[in-house]
């Protein structure tokens, strides 16, 4: 079992979900989200993790974000990126990866605040969520999806006001909500 900390943007997600139905292998596992803490093993302990998150969040207030723009990341993902609020999300991400989470930070993977839209790995590749960079890009499928996403002109504004701790099964076949953290207004 693993834990992750995510934000579910309070936006109309029908266009994103329709797109993800075609291209995102995780579409049925989790709603469109921004990940603040990636997979952390349950051995860290839920109580310790919750206390750490609460401690970090005591210094944070709600803040606006603007989702607009597309970016290829980790060589095979298409992301809806932040046009506003990027610095705040990165700063909060870094603060969360202190203390008990410091050993789990992945400096080898660039943190790009985003909503994942699709995975474009060649069919012969096996995707490992714990090591997302180890795939080859399916160029044809990626460029087709990129054109489609550009036509959608995805553009959303919302506020980061809550983060959600989720539990993820070892085989990444099930994600269960665990706890909500509300930022001060």
What are these regions (language model features)?
Residues 164-166:
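Active-site-proximal alpha-helix that buttresses catalytic centers in soluble enzyme cores
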Residues 71-79:
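Short, basic/glycine-rich phosphate-binding loops at helix/coil junctions
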Residues 1-66, 72, 83-162, 171-185:
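Basic, often amphipathic N-terminal segments
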